[in-house]
Amino acid sequence: MGPLQFRDVAIEFSLEEWHCLDMAQRNLYRDVMLENYRNLVFLGIVVSKPDLITHLEQGKKPSTMQRHEMVANPSVLCSHFNQDLWPEQSIKDSFQKLILRRHKKCGHDNLQLKKGCESVDKCKVHKRGYNGLNQCLTTTQSKMFQCDKHGKVFHQFSNTNRHKIRHTGKNPCKFTECGKAFNRSSTFTTHKKIHTGEKPYKCIECGKAFNRSSHLTTHKIIHTGEKRYKCEDCGKAFNRSSNLTTHKKIHTGEKPYKCEECGKAFKRSSILTTHKRIHTGEKPYKCEECGKVFKYLSSLSTHKIIHTGEKPYKCEECGKAFNWSSHLTTHKRIHTGEKPYKCEECGKGFKYSSTLTKHKIIHTGEKPYKCEECGEAFKYSCSLTAHKIIHTGKKPYKCEECGKVFKHSSPLSKHKRIHTGEKPYKCEECGKAFSRSSILTTHKIIHTGEKPYECEDCGKAFNRSSNLTKHKKIHTGEKPYKCEECGKAFKCSSILTTHKRIHTADKPYKCEECGKDFKYSSTLTRHKKIHTGGKPHKCNKCGKAFISSSNLSRHEIIHMGGNPYKCENVAKP
């Protein structure tokens, strides 16, 4: 029994028959033939394009084509259209001869002719104005075999046999590899390619191979760019009918796929399948490199880049490369200044959705992250993580250069710049560079002269909030920073830190020129002038210059002619 061919579903006209059809009938015929051809191509049945299809696509008459092989000389004249028709018995006889010729092994008894058109004269479609002969041929030929059990009609006798298997419930084709069974040998053959990895269908355009011809046919649309499936609601076009079906649910709001576990509904069955893994914990996608498993194929694809080290996404602006396209998209906003994520409450824009999410907490006042140890709540998860270290006392971040440890990674990153000398934050006004962005922000105030921090007690203004905080202690007399060694108290933590060196003899400031160590950075700065020979402090009276301001002050007493330091206990002579 031969496979299904285009000629099995095609009807051809002579020139005389073609002229009997009006324009609507011709268009209908053309649409049906082209649709039949496309369906066969989709199923991978048609390899080369028939001449009939070429003529129809070009809008030509099918007059050059030979009439279908089963058509004999007409013997009856149609009274409606002056068209030659066969008597009904001639139709049946001709079809039976053709079927027996093509299905010799089946036997005459196994073939049941479907009575699709009892009489040519009684054919309803013919009376409505369609070609009676070809309608009868189409009706008779397209549904030739009938199932005795359900009355279902089939095009070929082989389809009848396939259908009968459904009644028996048998799956004669079973695969030993996975135990899966099939009721058709063709489905069984296709399934085997999953295990063998065979991909016999190759795209001529790009070389990509597929294990099914239907997949290749679908793939080819990528190269042609054809989008023949159009949405009637919005006009959007798609290259696959399945994509159009999925798209239509946007307009209808339909979500037919419901999760039995939690009741959540979805537009697509594939999304439901993926969603179910949340409940089952299934992770079907495994990395061959390290064995790690993933719930989603996309997550595995993203993970694989870790092993290859590939960074295929490159920024055209600065040349920086990224593992993922999403990271490149996010990075580009640095150059464009784009802030697509806008707060509906205050209108402020953000580059990243995560930043907007954090920002929204300002308006809600929500503190969703709570410490289990002490109950303190935080706005951000990172703040909670940082807080937890207070309870553990751990300092997990260690400087490899000097061994200093930190509770958080960010202070370690800043600390490392002391060793590297890196100063990535540069002032556009004067070119001065800084190791921290906060220091640059503070520095910029020098150029603007702005002093936004004002003391409520005396009205004095400061360009830094830290300076205002220190100043306020003058009014309060507060000295919160106490030395554990000697009990001395200080207004500022920095002064306490400096003071502690008296007890420890720590000299962290080293001269690169001679290696001498100093307790204070100011002392090191003065010392460096010995090597440079610089004397920036000049006397206005005589022009003599000094290395330090204190030396200048002592010198100026000479010009004053006085002895400013007088002992009150010494008696006058």
Curated annotation (Swiss-Prot):
Which Pfam families does this one have?
Answer: KRAB (PF01352), zf-C2H2 (PF00096)
All copies of the KRAB domain together span: 4-75
ZnF segments: C2H2-type: 145-167, 171-195, 201-223, 229-251, 257-279, 285-307, 313-335, 341-363, 369-391, 397-419, 425-447, 453-475, 481-503, 509-531, 537-559
> Which InterPro entries does the annotation name?
KRAB (IPR001909), KRAB_dom_sf (IPR036051), Znf_C2H2_sf (IPR036236), Znf_C2H2_type (IPR013087)
Q: Which CDD domains match?
A: KRAB_A-box
Q: Which GO terms describe its molecular function?
A: DNA-binding transcription factor activity, RNA polymerase II-specific; RNA polymerase II cis-regulatory region sequence-specific DNA binding; zinc ion binding
Subcellular location(s): the record lists: Nucleus
* Gene Ontology cellular component terms for the protein in this record: nucleus
Say where the protein is mainly found: nucleus
Give the superkingdom in one word: Eukaryota
Keywords of this entry: DNA-binding, Metal-binding, Nucleus, Repeat, Transcription, Transcription regulation, Zinc, Zinc-finger
Keyword Metal-binding in the entry? The reply is yes
- GO BP, sorted A to Z: regulation of DNA-templated transcription
What this protein is reported to do is described as: May be involved in transcriptional regulation.
Q: Which PANTHER family match?
A: ZFP14 ZINC FINGER PROTEIN-RELATED, ZINC FINGER AND BTB DOMAIN-CONTAINING
Q: What does the similarity note say?
A: Belongs to the krueppel C2H2-type zinc-finger protein family.
| The protein's name | Zinc finger protein 66
- According to its UniProt entry, this protein's organism is Homo sapiens (Human)
| Gene name of the record | ZNF66
